[in-house]
């Protein structure tokens, strides 16, 4: 009997109270080639999670980043994994080697909001904190 094909994780966009999806809006503002590159990287994470460096890095506390190289630019998409879902929280184009604190703070704020809204007892026990396989 054949082994069933692996099922990909579902990708969801964080949605604000106003109904905006900041990562989707950020992606739409990028060039076609940049969207394709970032989309392919997210697709790889979706199908082979857990993934390690250089594609994905843990930022601690269940927050992860997809690291996409866009030629002269570098993109980061911050996300969490809950059960079988990848939730895209925030996207940036990096302008320096370090990620600005305000960008990380925003991603962590969205992480907290998402967990509070989706987990009735406000626990993040289902958030993947496990380091990816190397």
Feature locations, PLM:
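Basic, Lys/Arg-enriched alpha-helical interface segments
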Residues: 1-74, 83-86, 93-134
């Amino acid at each position: 009997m054949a082994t069933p094909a692996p099922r990909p994780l579902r990708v969801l966009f964080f949605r604000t109270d106003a109904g905006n999806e900041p990562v989707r809006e950020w992606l739409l503002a990028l060039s076609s080639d940049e969207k394709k590159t970032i989309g392919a990287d997210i697709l790889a994470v979706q199908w082979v999670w857990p993934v390690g460096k250089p594609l994905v890095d843990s930022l601690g506390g269940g927050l992860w980043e997809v690291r996409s190289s866009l030629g002269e630019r570098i993109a980061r998409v911050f996300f969490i994994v809950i059960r079988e879902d990848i939730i895209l929280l925030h996207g940036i184009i990096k302008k320096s080697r370090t990620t600005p604190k305000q960008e990380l703070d925003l991603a962590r704020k969205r992480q907290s909001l998402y967990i509070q809204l989706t987990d009735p007892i406000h626990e993040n026990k289902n958030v993947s904190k496990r380091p990816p396989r190397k």
